[in-house]
A protein has these predicted regions:
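Short loop-to-helix capping motifs
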Residues: 50-51, 123-125
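Transmembrane helix boundary and interhelical loop/hinge segments in multi-pass membrane proteins
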Residues: 29-53, 60
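Small-residue-rich transmembrane alpha-helices that serve as helix-helix interface/gating elements
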Residues: 162-167, 186-195
Length: 209
């Protein structure tokens, strides 16, 4: 509202909704997921590990740490920027910040795992990077629109696919989310995370490295 102080949470929310943070995360995820394959490191240790698929879990843990540090660092950095620009520091509602931050953290991590799976399955950094970046852009709304149209032609009305996708949840999560909205977002994030880790592990286990 006019006359109100701009809080750190206001700017963080705007950047998060615009997928500013997730863009950096997915680029790193693609590069990190295939770095050890390209360097030959996996070939050296692959024979020593009975279940190579378990190496995906170590990647996912590393990406989880990176995601947490990136999101937390971005929030604190925004606080410093607000203080420099506005000569004062107002964080915003602690309850809203906590619920929104944790929910977005889960959603961002799920999208990072999706990009990890894409990179591992395709084994092509260029194509994987293009797909990852497209996931963070409005181009996905075109895909969602086509899916919605196809579903409506099947007789199912009022169906919106973006309500069940990670990118959709990232964009739709309100500034002061309710408990149900957070639970729904966490549910979508968990489902995608489990599927992506399982798919990546299965492919990595069977692939000739």
């Amino acid at each position: 509202e006019p006359g109100e102080k701009v809080t750190v949470y206001d700017i963080f929310y705007a950047n998060s909704q615009g997928k500013f943070y997730v863009l950096f995360l997915v680029i790193f995820a693609v590069m990190f997921s295939t770095a050890d394959i390209g360097s030959g490191y996996i070939k050296n240790i692959g024979g020593q590990v009975q279940k190579r698929g378990t190496l995906i879990f170590s990647k996912s843990i590393a990406l989880a740490v990176f995601t947490v540090l990136t999101m937390a660092g971005a929030f604190l950095l925004q606080g410093a920027a607000n203080y420099i620009v506005f000569k004062e520091l107002t964080w915003g509602s602690s309850k809203a910040i906590l619920s929104y931050f944790l929910t977005e953290l889960a959603l961002h991590y799920a999208l990072v795992l999706i990009c990890m799976a894409i990179a591992i399955i395709l084994k092509n950094n260029v194509i994987s990077m293009v797909i990852a970046i497209c996931l963070t852009m409005n181009i996905m709304s075109i895909v969602y629109g086509l899916i919605n149209s196809a579903v409506r032609k099947m007789g199912i009305q009022n169906f919106q696919i973006y309500k069940y996708t990670i990118t959709g949840k990232i964009s739709l999560l309100p500034m002061n989310p309710s408990g149900n909205e957070c639970l729904e977002a966490f549910g979508v994030a968990i489902v995608f995370a489990v599927i992506m880790i399982a798919a990546s592990s299965a492919v990595f286990q069977k692939r000739d490295i």
